[in-house]
UniProtKB/Swiss-Prot annotation:
Protein name: Beta-ketoacyl-[acyl-carrier-protein] synthase III
Keyword Lipid biosynthesis assigned: yes
Pathway(s) served: Lipid metabolism; fatty acid biosynthesis
Binding partners and assembly: Homodimer.
Gene3D superfamilies: 3.40.47.10
Region: ACP-binding, residue numbers: 256-260
Source organism, top-level taxon: Bacteria
Family matches, as NCBIfam families: fabH, PRK09352.1
Primary role: Catalyzes the condensation reaction of fatty acid synthesis by the addition to an acyl acceptor of two carbons from malonyl-ACP. Catalyzes the first condensation reaction which initiates fatty acid synthesis and may therefore play a role in governing the total rate of fatty acid production. Possesses both acetoacetyl-ACP synthase and acetyl transacylase activities. Its substrate specificity determines the biosynthesis of branched-chain and/or straight-chain of fatty acids.
Amino acid sequence: MQNLGIAITGSGSAAPETSLHNEELSQLVETSDEWISTRTGIRQRRLALPTESLSSLAAAASRQAIASAGITASDIDLILLATSTPDDLFGTATKIQAELGATKAVAFDLTAACSGFVFGLVTAAQFIRTGVYQNVLLIGADILSRWVDWQDRRTCVLFGDGAGAIVLQSNQSDRLLGFALKSDGTQNHYLNLAYQGTAQEILPNIKITQGTYQPVTMNGKEVYRFAAQKVPEIIDKALFEANITVDQIDWLLLHQANQRILDTVAQRLNIPAHKVISNLANYGNTSAASIPLALDEAVREGKIKPNDIIATSGFGAGLTWGAAIFQWGR
């Protein structure tokens, strides 16, 4: 098959209308706006109502991305949904396919937690580069508010809900300049949303386990240490693969986990603060949605312009982390 280039030609985003401010969280747990904002940079987060679904947020973001790419849903060959919180554990990408009317698209979910969008970007690129598909819709979406313990101030202050989407298309020149992906399962226990079940005897001498997933648990200090060390390293590796220097980067777009992490990574890479894209003050950590949501906002605000070089990195549970260097537009 012919190897082709890829371009990111459209973006979109969606978030619930309901906002929860730091001051309101102090009614739930022992905290304050100052405590949260100084440690995380977060001031509010969006929360999905019981009537809202992951697929509805994802579809809204997708419609924007498809429109901005100048194509129709019927042009989409593949839909990749990066999420850890599907409407249906068997997968939600096909539900989005139906909502969009993308009748010819293959659709499946991809789970890599907060790294999901970057892992999905690289996965989508392989389908295009090998000539299998021409138009791919990549979505990052999560509703983690449904999976946090709202009495645990270590986690409930961090997460918000949202969705972001991009369209990738085959292109004469390759706009994905370089990437690197990593995983380390030995550190899985630092951040997880683990299954917790109870043994039940269904017949004599035959036991099964039934249960559900426990809320998000996290060792914040270890996750910070991991991100501060591994994210600059993997961005450097992706830059090497792209054969460009850090000075050529127009924008640093990291997973929006914590402002301290964003600042630390930028400092270690010697990237000035004005090149760092951050919107977590308004959305919190939206997991797989954070990068495409921030990307879309920056494009719509006129910050990111055609041909800008963007260094992006996702990192989180697994533990997983990855980086991609790409140019915006064709």
